[in-house]
Amino acid sequence: RKRNKIYALSDGASSYELTPNSPLPLLIQQNTEAGIFIGDDVNADEPQEVILFIRTNKKDSFSVSINGSALQQINADYPRLYDKLTGIKEPQHVTAFIVPANVVIQGNNKIVFSASANELILQRVELALKYGSVEECGYF
């Protein structure tokens, strides 16, 4: 409980002879859906901050909602601060959305993406639950 965590949708790559059950990579069109399971009881232990990291094949605009709530606030510094740019190759891009803590639920969370751009591909999804400082609550 109250440990910093990251929940992720795999990019679909196989490792250790295991093939993940993931919808990624996923072409983002109008109302493209992906689900992410959150094991934490976020109602009992509300995180200080929830951050949704989205990696796409290129930099382009798109919209995203979680459980029906549209996400508006982006923090351009977070991909670097949370070390999400390591291994990223041009023209890939990582966007960090701030998620209201009351939007996320324990269990399956529905994420809906929409983009008008052609061939915008969702490559990775990570949802970070920040409960406190690294010293108090551990690394992500």
Which residues make up each language-model segment?
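Beta-strand-rich recognition domains
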Residues: 1-140
